[in-house]
Amino acid sequence: MALLRRCLAVPSQLFLVLVVCVGPMGAALAQGVARAPAFAWRPRSSLQGSLVLLAVRPAVADSVIGIQGELAGEPLHFEPVGDEFRALGAVPLEARDSVVARIVIEGAGGASDTVIAPLNVRRRRAPRERLHAAPEFVQPPESLAERIRTERELVGEIKRRAHDTPRLWREPFVRPRAAAVTGSFGVVRIFNGVVRSRHLGVDFAGKRGAPVRATNRGVVAFVGDLYYSGTSVFIDHGAGLVTGYLHLSSTLVAPGDTVACGQLIGRVGASGRVTGPHLHWLADYGNLSVDPLDLITVDLNAPLTFGPGPEAKSRAGRQPD
């Protein structure tokens, strides 16, 4: 664990942006009697399919009674960190050029201000990988269509419910295996000569029976067999985050179990659509797939340096009834 902790890295670049401040605070800004909230994106520009950190420092922190937001259609779960509020979010794999976060700051007395902040998005390389799999996993028979649809809906519901779970983790995330990465996130997979999908996770080498560990504290949301994913474990870490451990040979946890960071949860296998034994590790923020290796470097409590943002454009907002 000590070695894993030494591997944690926090990006040093920080991007400050404030585009629009709307509402009573904005009106005060226009009259020169209040300062704008300061915002920080980490990283300053993001790859498609990445996890990002958004921090906001309100003009008057002790007057804030609530803060809500959304990015790419997924809610943001802000938490106070000193006089700031911070939240993780996700950039869709199909995003182009930029994404926009919308944040509502609720103040005392019922007043609220809305801030809109864009984040630059960079294209993720998508190399192609040719693989051979059993024909039934490339073009499943019609008789399995209902099963595949039901399983897709089940996994989607697990991801959605993670937004209803409070954040359960406090330690840094760790890798599920101390092994080489053999498959990268975002690769285009060509099975039996047919383009089937993007690779929405990271593969780790491992012989059948090798240990697989939980990458952080959470509640086991699913244990079972899925057509494409084989024997799988999904862990709800709360605040929108879910991790999955696929193609296992066996599992050591049950739905509803609370697992600790680094706890043994299963063993490497070759179940589902695979070309050989390995672990497929995935991470999702709500319904958005992100590179799970981004979890290793995320730190909600990392010290950030705020500076003055650009001048805000303001207009009068909704007044309390």
Describe each PLM feature range.
Residues M1-A9:
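N-terminal secretory signal peptides that target proteins for export/translocation
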Residues L3, L14, Q319:
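Short polybasic linear motifs
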Residues A9-V10, A316:
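Acidic, Ala/Val/Gly-enriched low-complexity intrinsically disordered segments
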Residues P11-P24:
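Bacterial N-terminal signal peptides
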Residues G26-A30:
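Sec/Tat signal peptide C-region and signal peptidase I cleavage site
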Residues G32-F185:
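Non-catalytic extracellular/periplasmic "stalk"
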Residues V174-G317, D321:
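Catalytic cores of peptidoglycan-degrading enzymes
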